[in-house]
A protein has these predicted regions:
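Histidine-anchored nucleotide/phosphate-binding helix
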Residues: 19-29
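Short catalytic-loop micro-motif centered on adjacent basic/acidic residues
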Residues: 36, 90-93, 115-117
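Conserved nucleotide-sugar phosphate-binding/catalytic loop shared by glycosyltransferases and other
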Residues: 2-14, 28-78
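A short helix/loop element that forms part of the nucleotide-sugar donor recognition site in Leloir-type
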Residues: 172-178
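Short, polar loop motifs at secondary-structure junctions
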Residues: 39-45, 99, 146-150
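Short N-terminal targeting/anchoring amphipathic segment
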Residues: 80-98
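Active-site-proximal region of nucleotide-activated glycan assembly enzymes
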Residues: 109-172
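Structural motif
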Residues: 5, 89-92, 140
Length: 178
C-alpha cells in the first residue's frame, strides 16, 4: 500500500519554532507517510539535505512583493497546486493565526482535512478575538504540550477544542550522540 502524503505548512514566525516543530513531526511521520514541509521561513532551505524530507518554500507576505489580498490568493493557489500534484488528503498548518490563503485552500478543496498545530501560551493580543471562529474552520486541532503549561493563562488555556499532546521536539534521546 502506498503511503499517504501529508502537507505540513508553517508560517514564517519570528524564530524557528514552527519550522522546527513541523520538521520533528515530519521525521516522526516518515515511516507511515510522505511528509512535505511547506514554509514561509527561509530556514527551510537546509531541511531537505539534512533530513531527507521534501520541502517547498513560499515567500511570506512579509516580503511585501504583493498586496495582502494577492498574497492570500497566491498562497491558496500554491497549496492547491501541491495538493493536486501529490494527492495529499491532509494538510496541517503550524502558526499562531491560519492565513486566509490556508483557509481558502480548505474551502476550495472540501475533502482536504485541515489540522491546526496551535501552540498554547498565547498572549492577550488582538488575534485572540478570532480564535473561536478560526478553530471552527479546522477539522482537527493539535496543541503540542509545553513545559510551561502550568503557567498558561492565555486565551487557549481553557479551550477544549484541541487535543493536547506530548511536547514536540527535534531532540531524540535515543539518537543523541552524547
Amino acid at each position: 500500500m502506498e503511503k499517504p502524503t501529508i502537507i505540513l505548512a508553517t508560517s514564517n514566525g519570528v524564530g524557528m519554532g514552527h519550522l522546527a516543530r513541523a520538521s520533528a513531526i515530519a521525521l516522526a511521520l516518515k515511516e507511515y507517510a510522505n511528509p512535505i514541509i511547506v514554509s514561509m521561513a527561509g530556514g527551510i532551505a537546509e531541511i531537505p539535505e539534512f533530513m531527507g524530507i521534501r520541502c517547498e518554500y513560499i515567500p511570506g507576505r512579509d516580503r511585501m512583493w504583493m498586496s495582502r489580498e494577492k498574497w492570500d490568493e497566491y498562497l491558496r493557489d500554491r497549496l492547491l497546486a501541491l495538493v493536486d500534484e501529490t494527492g495529499a488528503r491532509v494538510m496541517s498548518f503550524d502558526g499562531v493565526v491560519p492565513y486566509p490563503g490556508v483557509i481558502a485552500a480548505k474551502v476550495s478543496h472540501p475533502k482536504l482535512a485541515l489540522v491546526w498545530v496551535r501552540r498554547g501560551l498565547w498572549q492577550k493580543k488582538p488575534q485572540r478575538f478570532v480564535l473561536g471562529l478560526q478553530s471552527q474552520m479546522m477539522d482537527y486541532i493539535v496543541e503540542p504540550g509545553d513545559f510551561a503549561r502550568a503557567y498558561d493563562f492565555g486565551p487557549t488555556a481553557e479551550r477544549k477544542d484541541a487535543r493536547i499532546t506530548a511536547s514536540v521536539s527535534l531532540f531524540q534521546k535515543d539518537t543523541a550522540l552524547s
